[in-house]
């Protein structure tokens, strides 16, 4: 591993430069994926599944991966069996993750509110859960039982009555999803799992169909969960049919650090997210050139013993990753706010104070003892977060994702009469006189 001794992340030097937020976004590294480019390839898949249901989904799965399960829906007994066979330590860790996530998400549940505007005039905002949700759990480079937890817990807490998990079938497991995925579903009390992945899974969730044994595969009202570029494209296409959480891109970490940060921690955290994907983004923003150099040396040391060294090295060397040098922490705050990272670590003097100045991040991890890996598994927070700068306008998955606010308007005769003149005036101003007539005629005798 001598070549790793010379490993160095690319540098972006923003010192002595005064840049606007838009200029910062242009200067900062960002890879991402071109979803538009694959939409034409994915649309025929979605159309075929919309027309032919499970048959088309199974055909596409077989052509792409060489795997065709006997049925789309995994028999319930296999879920129970997977839980029974789950490693005891993994089960205990999953239970801790579930318990902590439930505690955090329970505090997110909104309550109905009623506003009384005048005697006999009320508007109530009633929060109602989505009725049926499809939760996508990817396959690929890793197994993600944690994604089962992060999708299911907020949906259950919101009160969603019906949910289905879709996850790619695995050849080594008889055309079923990975047993750890099945076990996590069983541990959470979810008994409907579909062995289908990719764009065809999203389409089948959106449009439903009939399984090979004649059982109904009911469509959902909303689809959540991350996936590859084809899954993202399918979600974009299907969003006129169902709701979606977001168009998730490759994972990303930004670390805002000063001279007090430990380069061992910084390097380990950059590597931890680079482990996901060759397109993963790892960005260090610092006012300390000494820390930047020490982090490079520590990256070389740790890469020598990293299991997925090729994948990690590709991610750290990609155009989406860099060490960004800034004049001071104030400039660093402006920089990370412009970047709007999925995960942002603060490793500085007065980390809580600095964190309080952050306005754009999917999740903020404060201090040396709050690594992103904690949030991935057992912090209690949700790890399904906005990527590609979307944290400037969007939030991570939460109980609110699965709730709909419905306004319930109730006026009595006197309350309507009191405001009727204003309604009629505004309807005339908008040249929609029938609106006013609908009120006026109620008071004709």
UniProtKB/Swiss-Prot annotation:
GO CC terms: cytosol
Protein name: Histidinol dehydrogenase
Matching HAMAP family: HisD
Keyword presence, NAD: yes
EC class (word): oxidoreductase
Organism: Mycolicibacterium smegmatis (Mycobacterium smegmatis)
Molecular function via GO: histidinol dehydrogenase activity; NAD binding; zinc ion binding
SUPFAM superfamilies named among the record's database cross-references: ALDH-like
Top-level taxon: Bacteria
Positions with a binding annotation for substrate: 251, 273, 276, 343, 376, 430, 435
Binding-site positions, NAD(+): 136, 200, 228
Lineage: Bacteria, Bacillati, Actinomycetota, Actinomycetes, Mycobacteriales
């Amino acid at each position: 591993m001598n070549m790793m001794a010379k490993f160095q992340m690319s540098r972006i030097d923003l010192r002595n430069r005064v840049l606007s937020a838009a200029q910062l976004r242009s200067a900062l590294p960002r890879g991402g994926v071109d979803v538009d480019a694959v939409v034409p390839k994915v649309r025929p898949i979605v159309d075929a599944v919309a027309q032919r249901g499970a048959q088309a989904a199974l055909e596409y799965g077989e052509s792409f991966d060489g795997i065709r399960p006997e049925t789309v829906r995994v028999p319930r007994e296999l879920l129970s069996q997977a839980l029974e066979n789950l490693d005891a330590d993994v089960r205990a860790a999953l239970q801790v993750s579930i318990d902590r996530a439930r505690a955090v998400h329970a505090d997110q549940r909104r309550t109905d509110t009623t506003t009384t505007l005048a005697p006999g005039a009320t508007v109530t905002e009633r929060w109602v859960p989505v009725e049926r949700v499809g939760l996508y759990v990817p396959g690929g480079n890793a197994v993600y039982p944690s994604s089962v937890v992060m999708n299911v817990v907020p949906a259950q807490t919101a009160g969603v009555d019906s949910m289905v998990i879709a996850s790619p079938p695995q050849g080594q497991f008889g055309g079923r999803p990975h047993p750890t995925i099945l076990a996590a579903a069983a541990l959470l009390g979810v008994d409907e799992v579909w062995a289908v992945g990719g764009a065809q899974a999203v389409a089948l969730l959106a449009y439903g169909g009939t399984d090979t044994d004649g059982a109904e595969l009911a469509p959902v009202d909303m689809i959540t969960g991350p996936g590859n570029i084809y899954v993202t494209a399918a979600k974009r296409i299907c969003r006129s049919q169902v709701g979606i959480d977001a168009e998730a891109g490759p994972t990303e970490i930004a670390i805002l650090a000063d001279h007090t940060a430990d380069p061992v921690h910084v390097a380990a955290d950059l590597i931890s997210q680079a482990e996901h994907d060759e397109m993963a983004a790892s960005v260090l923003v610092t006012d300390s050139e000494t820390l930047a150099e020490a982090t490079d040396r520590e990256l070389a040391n740790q890469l020598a013993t990293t299991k997925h060294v090729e994948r990690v090295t590709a991610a750290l060397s990609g155009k989406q990753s860099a060490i960004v040098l800034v004049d001071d922490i104030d400039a660093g705050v402006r920089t990370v706010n412009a970047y709007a990272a999925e995960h942002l670590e603060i490793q500085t003097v007065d980390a809580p104070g600095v964190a309080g100045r952050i306005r754009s991040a999917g999740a903020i991890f404060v201090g040396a003892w709050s690594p992103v890996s904690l949030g991935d598994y057992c912090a209690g927070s949700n790890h399904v977060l906005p990527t590609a700068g979307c944290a400037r306008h969007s939030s991570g998955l939460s109980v609110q994702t699965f709730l709909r606010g419905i306004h319930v308007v109730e006026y009595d005769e006197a309350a309507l009469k009191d405001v009727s003149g204003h309604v009629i005036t505004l309807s005339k101003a908008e040249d929609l006189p029938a609106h006013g007539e609908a009120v006026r005629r109620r008071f004709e005798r």
